[in-house]
Curated annotation (Swiss-Prot):
Name of the gene this protein is made from: moaD1
Pathway this chain belongs to: Cofactor biosynthesis; molybdopterin biosynthesis
Function, as annotated: Involved in sulfur transfer in the conversion of molybdopterin precursor Z to molybdopterin. Probably plays a role in host phagosome maturation arrest.
UniProt protein name: Molybdopterin synthase sulfur carrier subunit
Keywords tagged on the record: Molybdenum cofactor biosynthesis, Nucleotide-binding
Length: 83
């Protein structure tokens, strides 16, 4: 098992019970997509936002196939609207 730190911003934070960050324990070999699936089970309202976010691992935009390592920081980055 490894631990990753997950950060939530904006509407995603609201969907996650206003949790700004949390440490999540996952299996070795877990990728970002598996982590998102796990978090959607914990926070069902998160499903409504996952099509409109990008994921970052250690402050770099990362695909869902990115395998996580112990201590990684994973952030849900919501889209920004402009005008």
């Amino acid at each position: 098992m490894i631990k990753v730190n997950v950060l939530y911003f904006g509407a995603v934070r609201e969907a996650c019970d206003e949790t700004p960050r949390e440490e999540v324990e996952v299996q070795n070999g877990t990728d970002v997509g598996n982590l998102v699936d796990q978090l959607q089970q914990k926070y069902p309202r998160l499903r409504d936002h996952c099509q409109r976010v990008q994921m970052a691992v250690n402050q770099f935009i990362a695909p869902l196939s990115t395998v996580l390592g112990d201590g990684d920081e994973v952030a849900f980055i919501p889209q920004v609207a402009g005008g």
